[in-house]
Design a protein with these regions (language model features):
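Non-catalytic alpha-helical scaffolds and adjoining flexible linkers that form interface surfaces
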Residues: 1-246
Length: 246
């Protein structure tokens, strides 16, 4: 049965001489792998390579032949749903986008339907595309916190004089500096709490910090996810994020 859905490209792999296998995060079916036959072939009439539309992070409208429990699905049609202005061109925006996509690949199991997380990711990438690069510093932390919350690993509480620490194992702000609550310094705990309370991405730039504190918070968040999920492994894009976002 053919169905139309929105999709975000997570990964592409060459298959044969002219085809691709694409891993897509779809609105209706979660993460699925699709075979696109002949997409790398340059046609005589079009003189274009449609594989160029399938860059990592691309937002698509696709018509798919979906068969439950099949490991490799088939795409019948696809087109661009949103044309980026800077995400695939500007180094800072592209670095943040690639980090977000890699995090999704690490966290999302195949075929797990996550409609709310899909909608959030779609909006995150579009907002990122319209944001000045010098205002993106808190975006990776915000995206990581949001992914954790959508997948059921939300951190409870906020920073206060009564709860100045945060426990990585209990996922909560706490009054006690015991065990793993000392893993994040006070500046980091305050930054994490402030970003958690943001109601929109547009206000993230109002939260002032420095690159070292942001680095410590992002490292802490990834350690948090490693402890609370079975899917997290080393993030290849992490070192690039730290070097690009000052």
């Amino acid at each position: 049965m053919q169905q139309q859905t929105k999709a975000i490209v997570l990964r592409t792999t060459k298959y044969g001489e002219t085809s691709l296998i694409c891993t897509l995060f779809t609105e209706l079916f979660g993460v699925q792998s699709y075979l696109l036959k002949g997409v790398r072939h340059v046609g005589v009439k079009s003189k274009t390579n449609r594989a160029g539309l399938l860059q990592i992070g691309s937002q698509l409208d696709v018509v798919v032949e979906h068969k439950p429990n099949k490991s490799l699905q088939t795409i019948k049609e696809f087109g661009v749903a949103y044309y980026y202005q800077q995400v695939q061109e500007h180094v800072v925006a592209n670095t943040v986008a690639l980090y977000a996509i890699e995090l999704l690949l690490r966290l999302l199991p195949e075929a797990s339907i996550q409609t709310d997380l899909f909608d959030f990711t779609e909006q995150f990438l579009q907002t990122l595309d319209a944001t000045p690069p010098n205002e993106m510093g808190n975006y990776p932390i915000y995206f990581t916190l949001s992914c954790a919350a959508y997948l059921g690993y939300a951190i409870q509480g906020v920073y206060s004089e009564h709860t100045p620490f945060i426990s990585i194992s209990d996922a909560t702000f706490t009054a006690y500096n015991t065990g793993d609550a000392s893993l994040l310094k006070t500046d980091g705990v305050m930054l994490l709490s402030a970003i958690m309370q943001c109601t929109s991405m547009q206000t993230l730039s109002h939260i002032k910090s420095n690159s070292q504190t942001r680095k410590e918070v992002l490292d802490w968040m990834l350690l948090f996810l490693k402890q609370h999920t079975e899917h997290m492994h080393t993030m290849k894009s992490l070192a690039i994020i730290h070097s690009i976002l000052h």
